[in-house]
Amino acid sequence: MTDQIRTLQGRVVSDKMDKSITVAIERKVKHPMLGKIIVRTTKLHVHDENNECKTGDLVEIRECRPLSKTKCWTLVSVVEKA
């Protein structure tokens, strides 16, 4: 069994915290009865060591060990500046 490190891309929606950002991850799912494709959003708290992200940036994040009660993701890179 190989352990794969989960990486996701999302948009920064808040950078008000020190060394932390909130990232919104959008995914498309099919409604079970209607069959319509709908967009679901998940908000994650991400560790940003150097406070380099601003609201609106597109970022790549990686899962890591729990850093606090709500943070278990860390910033890999800024894909696109806002």
UniProtKB/Swiss-Prot annotation:
| Name this protein carries in UniProt | Small ribosomal subunit protein uS17
Taxonomic superkingdom = Bacteria
Q: Biological process GO terms, please?
A: translation
Q: Which family does it belong to?
A: Belongs to the universal ribosomal protein uS17 family.
Q: Which GO terms describe its molecular function?
A: rRNA binding; structural constituent of ribosome
Quaternary context: Part of the 30S ribosomal subunit.
Keyword rRNA-binding assigned: yes
GO cellular component annotations of the record: cytosolic small ribosomal subunit
Q: What are the coiled-coil residue ranges? A: none
Concerning PANTHER family, the annotation shows: 40S RIBOSOMAL PROTEIN S11 FAMILY MEMBER (PTHR10744), SMALL RIBOSOMAL SUBUNIT PROTEIN US17M (PTHR10744:SF1)
Q: Which Pfam families match?
A: Ribosomal_S17
Protein purpose: One of the primary rRNA binding proteins, it binds specifically to the 5'-end of 16S ribosomal RNA.
Q: What keywords are annotated for this sequence in UniProt?
A: Ribonucleoprotein, Ribosomal protein, RNA-binding, rRNA-binding
Q: Which InterPro entries match?
A: NA-bd_OB-fold, Ribosomal_uS17, Ribosomal_uS17_bact/chlr, Ribosomal_uS17_CS
